[in-house]
Amino acid sequence: SMDFQQMPIGFAMALAQNAAAMEAYAALSREAQSDILTRAHGARSEAEMHRIVSGIVNS
């Protein structure tokens, strides 16, 4: 299960808008999820956050 509490709000919102990314994220290992969350915490803009989320599907 996904812990939305640990997610930056912008990341959670972007993920919620992208069903494919949410499914792909849920299927990742904890380590891979953690790497993505680290990048999401460092995102400086909404556009960067969306790039991180869309990158989940394309990885």
Question: How would you describe each model-predicted region?
Answer:
Residues 1-59:
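Charged, low-complexity intrinsically disordered segments
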